Curated annotation (Swiss-Prot):
Interacts with PYL3, PYL5, PYL9 and PYL10. Binding to PYL3, PYL5, PYL9 and PYL10 is dependent on the presence of abscisic acid (ABA). Interacts with SAPK10. Mn(2+) 2 binds at D118, D306, D368. It comes from Oryza sativa subsp. japonica. This is Protein phosphatase 2C 50. Residues 60-377 form the PPM-type phosphatase domain.
Length: 387
């Protein structure tokens, strides 16, 4: 599988990067197969149309990142095409898959990962997340996949919660030095922490496949789906003054203090993160997860650190990204170039959108690092058949 060889596309200080998989139009016209659309999907399959679950699409994207007005660059990002194969039973019910004539136990969908990690106190944890989250997530998906055959009907949301929670907790344990390993003679040695106890990072991650987008968020980076002309927030910022977050912190004996904004113990301006072991158990690495079926009018995803979101609204970001992508294709043609391998090339349309958003945040006075990933979800070439 190409995921084994794929490395994360990294945006460092004042650099931009973009890589491409494949694009496509939904063959046969089935944009998504959801529980509420079972009859239509079955009818389409009977008419000779191909299910979205038999499509392989690596989305195209662009990434832009800058230190901005900050003294240090503490953001990191990752784009990893085909990092894992997802059991289709995590995306649809056995009943629906059987109705489509698909093997519910054997079928896997190629998945692609995008992530933004906004560090604080240093870049070490953000950089560690960039290198490790997709690896650990792939391992957790394989672990779950081995057990799916023994399960009955699967609660998709429950299993995705479990997969991402274990992934983020494992990375947090590694960062904090809470991992033990067996040495010669059978003894155990605890690993060293990656960095100081006051260093941490947000993590917002999107897993994209042909049928769904699955999002996990921990912290105050954000992901927004541009669906048609409307922004759809796929994450909710973890701020200490959020009612449920404040209640959780105070139930653990912690305090939320107003000190140049609401902060945990008067220090950290977010209520969840990876790292920050000096603020445990008040600051936790548990992500909130959302599973979203893809739709025909999905335009793009925007993942970004708060250097963008502090000065640009969801509505403006979607409007700008959509306009820049359309403008590029209007001036240069409908299709973006593809590499011979189907991944690893640049996508100038998505890159133009990411660059523009980064410059817009600077123009609006953002004082933080800014990292933006724009994932173009609009199909422009035929999808590859994986059946």
């Amino acid at each position: 599988m190409a995921a084994a060889a794929a490395a994360a596309a990294i945006c460092g200080e004042d650099e931009t990067a973009a890589r491409v998989g494949c694009t496509g139009e939904w063959a046969g016209g089935i944009e998504r197969v959801d529980l509420g659309e079972r009859k239509e999907a079955v009818a389409a399959a009977g008419a000779g149309k191909r299910s979205v679950y038999l499509m392989d699409c690596a989305p195209v994207w662009g990434c832009a990142s800058t230190r901005g007005r900050s003294a240090e660059m503490e953001d990191a990002s990752a784009a990893v095409p085909r990092f894992a194969d997802v059991p289709v039973r995590l995306l649809a019910s056995r009943r629906d898959l059987d109705a489509l004539g698909l093997d519910a136990d054997a079928l896997r969908l190629p998945a692609h990962l995008f992530g933004v990690f906004d560090g604080h106190g240093g870049a070490e944890v953000a950089n560690y997340c960039r290198e490790r989250i997709h690896v650990v997530l792939s391992e957790e998906l394989k672990r779950l996949g081995k057990n799916l055959g023994e399960m009955g009907e699967v609660d998709m949301k429950e299993h995705w919660d479990d997969v991402f929670t274990k992934c983020f907790q494992r990375v947090d344990d590694e960062v904090s030095g809470r991992v033990t390993r067996v040495v010669n003679g059978g003894g155990e040695v605890r690993s060293e922490p990656v960095t100081a106890e006051n260093v941490g990072s947000t993590a917002v991650v999107a897993l994209v496949c042909s049928s769904h987008v699955v999002v996990a968020n921990c912290g105050d980076s954000r992901i927004v789906l541009c669906r048609g002309k409307e922004p759809v927030a796929l994450s909710i910022d973890h701020k200490p003054d959020r009612k449920d977050e404040r209640a959780r912190i105070e139930a653990q004996g912690g305090k939320v203090i107003q000190w140049n904004g609401y902060r945990v113990s008067g220090i950290l301006a977010m209520s969840r993160s990876i790292g920050d072991r000096y603020l445990k158990p008040f600051v936790i690495p548990k992500p909130e997860v959302m599973v979203v079926p893809r739709a025909k009018d999905d335009d793009c995803l925007i993942l970004a650190s708060d250097g963008l979101w502090d000065v640009v609204s969801n509505e403006e970001a979607c409007k700008v990204a959509r306009r820049q992508i359309l403008l590029w294709h209007k001036n240069n043609g409908a299709a973006s170039p593809l590499s011979d391998e189907g991944e690893g090339s640049t996508d100038p349309a998505a890159q133009a959108a990411a660059d523009y958003l980064m410059r817009l945040a600077l123009k609006k006075g953002s004082e933080d690092n800014i990292t933006v990933i724009v994932v173009d979800l609009k199909p422009r070439k035929k999808l590859k058949n994986i059946s």
